[in-house]
Design a protein with these regions (language model features):
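N-terminal amphipathic, basic helical "cap/leader" segment at the start of enzyme domains
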Residues: 1-82, 175
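Short, electropositive alpha-helical surface patch
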Residues: 137-148
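Generic beta-strand structural signal
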Residues: 84, 117, 149-151
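A general secondary-structure junction signal
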Residues: 50-54, 90, 157
């Protein structure tokens, strides 16, 4: 699949099959993430954690459910049944917000690579926020001291055919 086609086809998958992605595909997705632009080239300010363990998913789901209930007053299951999750954590950046931009670039590259490989994906922040606020999960996921989980991506094969939505963003062109 060509790059622009993968970008156009990428959509958020919210229901996955149990089938695990291959190690080769996982490595390709990681390579794409590590090829992302990072402010000032500070790649060492980022850390990637891969989770493929159902027991840990249960703990993450419980923490996410608790966090969402606190924030929104309702229960939601947010793992989407994905067999792989990748968390990207960051040290605080020198410029405000740069850690969020860096993380987003890494995960968008991963999402486009996954789409090109026929792997469904969704980038989301709830699990990263839940891990950030849970010392036990931070320890289980071996998040290094001084790093904060920013976002994660769930990966797997979609349980249904995904049709990308058309999105519009207001554009001003100044000449």
């Amino acid at each position: 699949m060509e790059t622009l086609e993968a970008i156009a086809k990428r959509t958020s998958t919210r229901k996955f099959k149990e089938t695990q992605i291959s190690e080769d595909n996982l490595q390709e997705i990681l390579k794409a993430g590590m090829s992302a632009p990072v402010g000032s080239g500070l790649y060492e300010s980022l850390h990637i954690t891969i989770v493929q363990n159902q027991n840990i998913f249960s703990k993450i789901n419980a923490a996410v459910t608790e966090l969402i209930f606190k924030m929104m007053g309702k229960k939601m299951d947010k793992n989407f049944g994905a067999p792989t999750m990748i968390f990207v954590s960051s040290k605080p950046a020198m410029m405000p917000g740069l850690e969020y931009a860096n993380t987003a670039c890494v995960l968008e590259n991963m999402a486009i690579a996954a789409t090109s490989l026929g792997i469904g994906n969704v980038i989301w922040g709830g699990a990263a926020s839940a891990v950030e606020q849970n010392a036990e999960l931070r320890k289980i996921l071996e998040i290094p001291e001084g790093y904060k989980p920013i976002l994660c991506i769930s990966l797997g094969y979609s349980s249904k055919d995904e049709v990308p939505k058309k999105h519009e963003i207001t554009v001003n062109k100044i000449i």
